[in-house]
Amino acid sequence: MAPAKWLIASLAFASTGLAFTPEDFISAPRRGEAIPDPKGQFAVFPVSKYNFDTKDRPSGWNLLNLKTGDISVLTTDADVSEITWLGEGTNLLYVNGTDSVKGGVGIWISDAKNFGNAYKAGSIPGAFQGFKLAKSGDKINFVGYGQSTTKGDLYNEAAIEKPVSSARIYDSLFVRHWDAYVGTQFNAVFSGALTKNGNKYSFDGKLKNLVQPVKYAESPYPPFGGSGDYDLSPDGKTVAFMSKAPELPKANLTTSYIFTVPHDGSKVAEPINKRNGPRTPHGIEGASSSPVFSPDSKRIAYLQMATKNYESDRRVIHIAEVGSNKPAQRIASNWDRSPESIKWSSDGRTLYVTAEEHATGKLFTLPSDARDNHMPSAVKHDGSVSAFSFVGSSKSVLITGNSLWSNALYQIATPGRPNRKLFYANEHDPQLKGLGPNDIEPLWVDGARTKIHSWIVKPTGFDKNKVYPLAFLIHGGPQGSWGDNWSTRWNPRVWADQGYVVIAPNPTGSTGFGQKLTDDITNDWGGAPYKDLFKIWEHVRDNLKYVDTDNGIAAGASFGGFMINWIQGQELGRKFKALVSHDGTFVGSSKIGTDELFFIEHDFNGTFFEARQNYDRWDCSKPEYVAKWSTPQLVVHSDYDFRLSVAEGVGLFNVLQEKGVPSRLLNFPDESHWVTKPENSLVWHQQVLGWINKFSGINKSNPKAIKLSDCKVEVIDHEAGSYFDY
């Protein structure tokens, strides 16, 4: 380790103890979407909880009473990977990952009131998920997805012979995407049917691949696609799915289409919004998402962006008639928000949509025939919405949400009425005890061009008459935000309860504050966002007397990691005692190694070879910037990060070490852009929090705060000093 003066200021900081620890954070129960039964009496949701003693994560399913809010255990069988309502009373279909077919799954039918009394309806010969069901005569038609072979069969990894060579050969992009190299198999939506014999349903094992007949199509689209990428019409006859435009280069453009196809696959799927097609509004050629059929199965609502290479363009609601050549209608197209999901009311007259607004994921309603200037109405609820479903045939919805202060909020919301709380995790889980909205507040500051929002997150037991070091956290994206939602990776409450006041800014480039703020970061990564951050820091220094900026730290991931590297070479870098850069770009020209070229080609106004000056403009590795480096910096980068190569982190660490800047590299060979495995997450928190606590003085003021020595992973240290010491 290079010798250096690691100075710690000895200040009388407020000591918070450790109300919310990384262990609490990682081991707290994690609950999924609550899905109500057809009559709106009960909802089923998954739950899991990591155990540090046994090193496993037991999982199961619970039943939520929508009248009382009471929760009961439905099953603790970890092999049950998915449950959905059959559409008949309290009958359920569930998927069991252990099956007689090696590598396959079993389809089981049960009743929520007597779950143990289940029967097997059939087997599917491969991994399969995302069931959607609809009655069609005496059958229940279904769709779901798995991976497809090039021939169109459901891919079963257990049945594939291992090739004698490990070579990969590519003639087009992608080569790798997010955390994996692209192979010959691809995602596809398959259809099938359950047939009723007496009182029981059975599945004959026959699946129809609805995607493979369209050459180069894929749905759901990786890495984050899921069941929201397709839908089954209520009459069970038609399927809609989203795929990237098959005829266009996928790594360079975001253009995608909504396809429709008969459930039985009797015709090849066709796009309803092909660019320059007769049904597509003029100039609309961006990414499509969230197809959903109307209750009468005659219309499809979907979202689409305009720009063909911009993943953060504004989404606009479109409605197309099934089987018609009429152009799709744009709904509330002047609304300066970007919807994320849609559902129809039972009468088809109202759309319920989610959209981010001012750092909160909100639920809105609007008429399904709304004109361009219509402004949707917000529905009252707590926290941010992650999913919602209608309660029976009413206008009320069951919201699955979360917030900065709770990882699960189940509530009933009805337009024009107060929300009704069912279950809030922070009021039940001992790991979340003491968390609440009182420690969170918004902050608005004049930025480089407009007012900029931040969150102030205070530690448990906060005392305004005491002083707390600043933790300045910069989000990724850059087109993203610090929202009022729970993060399972970078969670401001964990940082705050080390003894900090967290400031989480939403500078230029952030989403949810109007499309202009999002767009304004284009080709300006180190410009307006940096100025915004500096102005926020100055405001905190001058106005928040309970925040000690002299002993503050700054940290960020992805774009936030880039910004930390940029700050290190700028004036703001001298304002912090320590920095943490997680998966941030370092060398401007290295961006060409990313997977999604459309991202950099949009954000830097051209290709790597045609607009090279734009890539070099915000190059953190320029000698004039590196010459200013002096703030201790922790670098985090993992091997499976194919969005930003691990070489970026290693190169950054190389320069920090050669310059003699106190520094450390944290690397995970089995993680990607995100660190998600529980034991790795614990080490991440021990190293990141231990690093900032060492330099901020927290370790002296709060004996219970995390120290670097708390991590039991051995440090690799082979040298006595810096290159420049000799």
UniProtKB/Swiss-Prot annotation:
GO terms for cellular component: extracellular region. Residues 1-19 form the signal peptide. Its main location: secreted. Disulfide bonds: none annotated. Glycans are attached at residues 96, 252, 485, 605, 699. Residues 268-292 are annotated as: Disordered. GO terms for biological process: proteolysis. InterPro entries: 6-blade_b-propeller_TolB-like, AB_hydrolase_fold, PD40, Peptidase_S9_cat. Extracellular dipeptidyl-peptidase which removes N-terminal dipeptides sequentially from polypeptides having unsubstituted N-termini. Contributes to pathogenicity. This is Dipeptidyl-peptidase 5. The gene is DPP5.
